[in-house]
């Protein structure tokens, strides 16, 4: 089976001279993959327009996700990026650096995205359509990017759209559970289009881990049957960092 980029591309956390770029490879034949990336001033990626490039290794340890931090870019400029493995090229994403000064900022602001509710989840596609006509400077997501419930938890099974149930169909507890839910979310074409259209700035709320979570637990966590809260929380946040185009401690600069 040929390697693919079925979960799309994304960018995020823009600075005046850099931003994070993200993708995920699927159907890898082996225990790891070397992923090439390029950032260009042109969507055609002619050699003279390539401004930064590199290679990143990924594996199942990162759920086959990759992030890069191109630097040395100019403030307030548009850029294009893509990834490549074994001759297979990802979709092209668009990102922009922050301007040195801006009299105004154009943002799309989103939160609380329940995959099973297609009526509201369609908002992602609409954001991408609007961006194509009137580009956003950033896409700001204020959390509840995913929901941790199992089938029938939220919304009720009766209101879930046929063939649009949660994967896995049980409540998320393990790292594999959370990873599977993120993969399901990014099977949505509208979400992929939006993430490729403009840089994202994101924070988590509670449902990225569990409903009404706090340091020592959550309303939707029962330690006697669901295990250690700290292990669940850490698994949830690991998956979040893997799938979101944001800076991690290893990507931060002093």
Regions found by a protein language model. Give the residues of each.
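Metal-dependent phosphoester/phosphodiester hydrolase catalytic core
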Residues: 1-254
């Amino acid at each position: 089976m040929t390697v693919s980029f079925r979960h799309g591309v994304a960018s995020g956390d823009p600075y005046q001279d850099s931003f994070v770029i993200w993708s995920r490879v699927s159907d890898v034949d082996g225990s790891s993959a070397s992923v090439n990336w390029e950032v260009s001033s042109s969507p055609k990626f002619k050699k003279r327009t390539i401004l930064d490039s590199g290679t990143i290794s990924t594996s199942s340890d990162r759920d086959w996700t990759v992030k890069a931090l191109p630097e040395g870019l100019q403030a307030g400029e548009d850029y294009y990026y893509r990834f490549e493995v074994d001759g297979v090229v990802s979709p092209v994403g668009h990102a922009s650096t922050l301007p040195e000064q801006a009299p105004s900022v154009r943002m799309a602001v989103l939160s609380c995205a329940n995959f099973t509710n297609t009526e509201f989840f369609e908002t992602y596609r609409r954001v991408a359509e609007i961006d194509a006509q009137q580009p956003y400077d950033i896409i700001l997501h204020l959390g509840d990017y995913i929901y941790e419930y199992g089938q029938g938890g939220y919304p009720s099974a009766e209101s879930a759209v046929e063939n649009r149930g949660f994967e896995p169909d049980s409540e998320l507890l393990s790292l594999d559970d959370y990873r599977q839910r993120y993969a399901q979310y990014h099977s949505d074409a509208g979400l992929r289009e939006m993430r490729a259209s403009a840089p994202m700035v994101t924070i988590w709320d509670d449902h990225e881990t569990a409903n009404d979570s706090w340091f020592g637990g959550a309303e939707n966590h029962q330690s006697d049957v669901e295990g250690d809260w700290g292990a669940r929380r850490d698994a949830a946040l690991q998956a979040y960092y893997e799938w979101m185009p944001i800076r991690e401690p290893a990507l931060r600069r002093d």
